[in-house]
C-alpha cells in the first residue's frame, strides 16, 4: 500500500511539474485578423503552433473618435463578428491566450489626455474584456488582454492607459498587457508605458529597422536584444516577419534563426519566445522553428 501511495504521489508531482513547465515555457505568438484568406481563428489555434493569438486591430480610437475594430476581410464588427465568440473560446479552452491589439501601422488613433486614456480603458474593459456592455462586437467571449502596437505619436498617455487597464485586475479575470515596440531603444511611442513595469509581454519588432535587425549577420540584432532585456517586463519576445513578404526587411531564414539567433537569446532570463507577423504570411515558418523556440 505504501509503495502505491508513493507511486501515486510521484505521478501527481510529475503532472504538476509538466503543467508548470507548459504554462511557463516559451511560445510562438501570432497576429491574426488583417487578411480574410488567412484561415479562421479556430483553425489558427487548432494548428498547435501558437501559444498566444493577437486579434488585430482596434485601429481608430481616442481624441473624441468612436473606437472601431478592423478585422479586414473576416467580418464586419458592426454587424456580424459574434461568430468569433465560439472561436475565441475554442482557443482559450486549448490554453491559448487571445489578446486584442490596439493601434497598428495604419489607422487614426491617439490619446489626448489622462481622462481620454481612462475612458478608452473603460471602453476596452466593458466591450472586450471582463466588463459589460450592450454592444460587444465579439459576443460574450472575454478576451485575455490588450496589446499595444503603437507606431505613431509622441508617446504621451499610453502609460496612463496601461495603468487604467491594470486597475481592472481586481480579483476578476486577469488582464494581460503586451507591447510591440520597434527595436530602436528607446521606442518613441511605447518606452514610457513599458517603464511602468505593468507589461507582461514585450514582443519587439526586430524588422524594418536595419540598425537592430538581422542582415546576414545576427550581431546588430543580438546587441539590440541585450538592451531590450533590461526593460521592465516579465518576458521579452523576438518579433519577426513570418516571410519575406511580411515586412520590408528583417526576415530571418528558419535555419539561420535556429542556428545563429535562438541559441543565444534563449539564455536570457526574460526570453519568452518568438512573435510572428502575421498568420497570413505564416506558410510553414512557425512549423519549421517550433521545436527550437
Curated annotation (Swiss-Prot):
Reaction catalysed by this enzyme: Random endo-hydrolysis of N-acetyl-beta-D-glucosaminide (1->4)-beta-linkages in chitin and chitodextrins
Lineage top rank: taxon: Eukaryota
Signal peptide positions (record): 1-25
Organ and tissue specificity: Accumulates in leaves during infection.
An MF annotation (GO) of this entry: endochitinase activity
Location of the GH18 domain: 26-293
Record keyword Iron-sulfur present: no
Subcellular location: Secreted, Extracellular space
Keywords, in A-Z order: Carbohydrate metabolism, Chitin degradation, Disulfide bond, Glycosidase, Hydrolase, Polysaccharide degradation, Secreted, Signal
Catalytic site: 151
Gene3D superfamilies documented for this protein: Glycosidases (3.20.20.80)
Keyword Secreted found: yes
Annotated EC: 3.2.1.14
Gene Ontology cellular-component annotations: extracellular region
Transmembrane segments: none
Physiological role: This protein functions as a defense against chitin containing fungal pathogens. This endochitinase also exhibits exochitinase activity, i.e. it is capable of hydrolyzing chito-oligosaccharides, including chitobiose.
Name listed for the protein in its UniProt record: Acidic endochitinase SE2
Naturally occurring in which organism (per UniProt): Beta vulgaris
Source lineage: Eukaryota, Viridiplantae, Streptophyta, Embryophyta, Tracheophyta
Amino acid at each position: 500500500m505504501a509503495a502505491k501511495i508513493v507511486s501515486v504521489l510521484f505521478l501527481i508531482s510529475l503532472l504538476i511539474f509538466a503543467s508548470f513547465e507548459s504554462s511557463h515555457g516559451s511560445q510562438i505568438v501570432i497576429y491574426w485578423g488583417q487578411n480574410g484568406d488567412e484561415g479562421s481563428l479556430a483553425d489558427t489555434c487548432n494548428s498547435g503552433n501558437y501559444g498566444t493569438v493577437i486579434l488585430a486591430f482596434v485601429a481608430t480610437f481616442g481624441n473624441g473618435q468612436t473606437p472601431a475594430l478592423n478585422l479586414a476581410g473576416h467580418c464586419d464588427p458592426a454587424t456580424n463578428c459574434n461568430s468569433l465568440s465560439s472561436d475565441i473560446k475554442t482557443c482559450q479552452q486549448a490554453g491559448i491566450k487571445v489578446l486584442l491589439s490596439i493601434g497598428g501601422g495604419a489607422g487614426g488613433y491617439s490619446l489626448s489626455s489622462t481622462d481620454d486614456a481612462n475612458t478608452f480603458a473603460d471602453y476596452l474593459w466593458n466591450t472586450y474584456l471582463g466588463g459589460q456592455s450592450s454592444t460587444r462586437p465579439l459576443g460574450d467571449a472575454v478576451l485575455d488582454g490588450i496589446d499595444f502596437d503603437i507606431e505613431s505619436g509622441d508617446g504621451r498617455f499610453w502609460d496612463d492607459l496601461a495603468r487604467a487597464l491594470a486597475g481592472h485586475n481586481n480579483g476578476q479575470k486577469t488582464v494581460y498587457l503586451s507591447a510591440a515596440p520597434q527595436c530602436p531603444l528607446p521606442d518613441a511611442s511605447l518606452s514610457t508605458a513599458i517603464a511602468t513595469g505593468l507589461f507582461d509581454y514585450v514582443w519587439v519588432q526586430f524588422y524594418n529597422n536595419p540598425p537592430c535587425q538581422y542582415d546576414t549577420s545576427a550581431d546588430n540584432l543580438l546587441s539590440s536584444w541585450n538592451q531590450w532585456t533590461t526593460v521592465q517586463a516579465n518576458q521579452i519576445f523576438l518579433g519577426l516577419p513570418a516571410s519575406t513578404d511580411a515586412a520590408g526587411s528583417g526576415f530571418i531564414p528558419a535555419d539561420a534563426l535556429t542556428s545563429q539567433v535562438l541559441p543565444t537569446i534563449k539564455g536570457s532570463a526574460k526570453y519568452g519566445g518568438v512573435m510572428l507577423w502575421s498568420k497570413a504570411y505564416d506558410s510553414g515558418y512557425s512549423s519549421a522553428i517550433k521545436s527550437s523556440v
